[in-house]
Amino acid sequence: MLIIIHRVNSIEKLKEVPKEYGVEIDVRAEGKTLILNHDPFLGGEALEEYLKHFNHKFIIFHLKETGIEDSIIDLAKKFKIADYFFLDMENPLVYKATRERGFKKIAVRYSEAEPIEFALAHKGLVEWVYIDTQTILPLDKYLYKRLKGAGFKLCLVCPNLFGRRDDINKYREFMQENNIYMDAIMTELEDAREWKRD
């Protein structure tokens, strides 16, 4: 299972992340430069400079605005980064990218507020489903089998990103008991070991 560390938006933070982990970054434009920041109007480090230091397993490009996708793809190619997906690409762009260009490095969301039917409608079109855990784990054995049977890779959001560290062990135990296996977990660096232990 791949561990992906949440919101690693600086080179300094990137250097703290073990190489065997992935990272999630927030990408937006500032003029003609792609920068990293979760919030608007605050500036941030240039994505291109950041990628010079990236030597990790995976990257989630969390899109904070539209129209920057092709520039990110170009930078990923420049730095020979093949293992990544886009998160929060707008639906019209997902439609165009998947159906007109055959681009699959995209995650669609599934959660208690986002129906599984939306994810399943992208069977064969995108590689990943991003499973949010705002208040619950929205999976049981049946729903898990539907998603895996459709060929998706699954990335689960750690409940502690919503302030529920106590749920980590509950989720781990539930998944083990029900033979539910995630391809990736997005979590904070301090919680990574909780997901890796047997």
Segments (PLM) and residue ranges:
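Phosphate-group recognition and catalysis centered on beta-loop-alpha active-site segments
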Residues: 1-198
